[in-house]
Amino acid sequence: MGQDVFLPIGVFIALLIVWEVAVQLFGIPVYLLPAPSVIWTDTVAIAGTIGNHTLATLGTVVVGFFISFAISLPLAVFMTSSPLISSAIYPLLVLTQSIPKVALAPILVVMLGANELPRLVITFLVAFFPLVIAIAVGLVAVPDELIELGRSFKASKLQELYRIRLPYAVPFIFSGLKVAIALAVVGAVVGEFVNADKGLGYMIITATAFFKTPVAFGSLILLSIMGVVLFQIVVIIERIFFPWSAANQETTIG
């Protein structure tokens, strides 16, 4: 456990040191590649402002993520209820996923208005596909022996879902949740690039427009930290409430 935590931190610190030394050694201009020390100083100088923008992005990420989960779960159940339904819906899901979200964002602004809604829709769309697919795969991955066992006890379709399929699908669901929460951060920023007056994506666009590259890098680093923290929250929830699922995934990865 300690190695899993301290090794990445050590590598990250080493990269920061190399970055700092390289910038100083080669005299790279601040507007091209600021040193980590400059990024830290300039970001801390506007801590209050950038904190508010961080909370704005976090709100969009969390709301969009929960909406994607709330829709993905029943849709996956519906899809897997019949091969015919799955064949009808799956191509539509692939179609929506293949649409570039950066190209879709300005269209959504025109359709839905210059407000929070387009950003939420983009966040939802980015997080939705991997989640619904992961849940659907988990629901149909149940061994036939378990299904036959349930039917031998005269389990109804609803009981089969709640007592067999959903518990078996938990590791798949959490795999999808981990991917979805990371992608939700990306979706929120894409939405902010196109239409926003707040958020870290807005900060990056504004900072680069005025050549405040350290602030842009600071915002980018905060986005990365946000993604890692949210990912770890999902991991912790899985370990606390579904320890057998977490152990199963760790064994599979290991």
Describe every region a protein language model picked out.
Residues 121-125, 158-191, 218, 223:
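Transmembrane alpha-helices
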